[in-house]
Each structure stands twice: as C-alpha cells, then as structure tokens.
Amino acid sequence: MNWTELSIIINHEAVELATNILENHGSNGVVIEDSDDLINQPEDKYGEIYALKKEDYPDKGVRLKAYFNELTYDDKLRQRIKDELLNLDELDQHNVQFSEKIIAETDWENEWKNYFHPFRASKKFTIVPSWETYAKEADEELCIELDPGMAFGTGDHPTTSMCLKAIETYVLPQHSVIDVGTGSGILSIASHLIGVKRIKALDIDEMAVSVAKENFRRNHCETLIEAVPGNLLKDETEKFDIVIANILAHIIDEMIEDAYNTLNEGGYFITSGIIKEKYEGIQSHMERVGFKIISEQHDNGWVCLVGQKVSE
C-alpha cells in the first residue's frame, strides 16, 4: 500500500482550522513546518530545542504535510479537502499552494523519521524514537520508546499530550487500566511506567495491535500488557478502574455507556480526540449517563475530558 503526502502552504491564521480539516478527513498525522520557527527558534515549554534546517521550511507562512493511504484517498476526498480549505475565512486565497507526492509503503517509516525526535510530551513523559539514543534529564522523567510504524502518529498530537497529563494526575499504581483504540500503545506504556500492573490494550485494527505489541516489547512490558483486537467495549465483561480512549468524537459518543458500565465505582474515564465544536455534546452525554466531569483540558482546538463514575 502506498501513501499520499498532501503538502499545503498557507498563512498562519488558517493553520489550526486547516489542521483540523486534514485530521477529520483521516490524515495519519500532520507535520507543521512554520517559517517563523527559523526566526524565533524558541525553547519549548519543557526545555527541548533542536537545530532547524532552512530547507525544511517554506519561505513564508506554514507548510502542512498530511498523510493518507491509497485505500481512502481518492478524487472525491481530494476535492472535498480542497473545497473545505478554500472556504476558510481565515485563508489568504492569494498565498495558498497545494502539492502531492506518493510515498511507497517501504519508505513510510523513513519519512516519519525525518520529523520524529525525542520530546517532552508532558511533565513526566518523554517520547523517544526507537532509533535514537536519549539520556534522561531527571530521575523522575519517564521515557517511552516508540516506533509509530506505518499508520500511527508519533505521540506529539495535543490529544496524546493531554491524555498523558491526565494519566499523570489520575492513574495510580494500584489501578487497573483498559486502553481503547490503543494505536501505537503509547498510553498503555505510560500507564505501565506509572506502575500499573493490570493493563489491557484494545484496537479494532489488527495492524495496530501488532504495532502496539512491538512497542510494548521495546519498553520491556510485552508480558505485562494484554494486547488484543476488540470492537470498543461492546464485548468487555471485566471491570477496570480506568478507561482511556483517545479516538474520534463520534466513536467516543457511541461508547460512553459501555465505558461507564466497564468502570468500577469511583473509576475514571479519560477521553480525548474531541474537537472543540463537539466537546459540549460529549460532556453532556457523559453527565447524562452518570459521569461527574472532574477535568477539562483544551489545546489547539482539541479537548480532553475526565469523568468519574460516582453514585448519586
């Protein structure tokens, strides 16, 4: 299977909405190359900074690179994405450029490696590519070694970062965790590093399960995390203290009742993948089912909610 890299150069004001459009239409990751970074090169909020190459950035504006597999990226989807982007009020119509290139499946992982470096994803967690060597900066730093494979992001998406922050806050070593839509397995690995002994990772995609298992092996927890194909929580009979789901909003909406029923009393539902336009509906649904919303994070147009199962 081949992949299409859709490259779009746009003005800064349109970046957030354009990124949401690409992700909502199924892009397996969006790379953001901002020309301002060459000028400012600021130290990020966790103290990481890397040397930037001028040739990797547009002369002005921002280049977005989105990745679609050949099974889903057809002429209809191409035109739909273009129409939605061109209809953005924030878009400067005179300074927008579209281009595409095909990336063979065998080159996909190497393409990602050009953009994937160690980075601090939250206060405690640092994501480290499996092909790089990294020395911890502090004893309390928890490193997740990750190889995203061909169809999964690198862990730098706001929804992942927010979930990691929620795990830091609410997950304790004595808890049990079920990770729904595990993808690369990053949130299961984070739970393991917190000290959780009972973890189950589900994904409807068997390739995701395979990628997750390989990442569990890299992090020396392959025998400690149960990774299995599963259709959300529809067939789940066991109870857990924590349900984690970093998936799309409409899928979260389908599983809220099942998440509530899967949790032990007092347990937490940590969920993200929710765009800001849909989070109020998700929050209302969670509250109707019986969740008490105890945390709400916002980052770059995305929302992470934490609901606790409590008795009336």
UniProtKB/Swiss-Prot annotation:
Reaction(s) catalysed by this chain's protein: L-lysyl-[protein] + 3 S-adenosyl-L-methionine = N(6),N(6),N(6)-trimethyl-L-lysyl-[protein] + 3 S-adenosyl-L-homocysteine + 3 H(+)
UniProt keyword annotations, A-Z: Cytoplasm, Methyltransferase, S-adenosyl-L-methionine, Transferase
Subcellular localization(s) per the UniProt record: Cytoplasm
Gene3D superfamilies: Vaccinia Virus protein VP39 (3.40.50.150)
Top-rank taxon: Bacteria
EC number: 2.1.1.-
Gene Ontology terms for molecular function: protein-lysine N-methyltransferase activity
GO biological process assignments: methylation
Gene Ontology, cellular component aspect: cytoplasm
Residue positions binding S-adenosyl-L-methionine: 160, 181, 203, 246
InterPro entries: Ribosomal_L11_MeTrfase_PrmA, Ribosomal_PrmA_MeTrfase, SAM-dependent_MTases_sf
Similarity annotation: Belongs to the methyltransferase superfamily. PrmA family.
Entry function: Methylates ribosomal protein L11.
Name assigned to this protein: Ribosomal protein L11 methyltransferase
Gene that specifies this protein: prmA
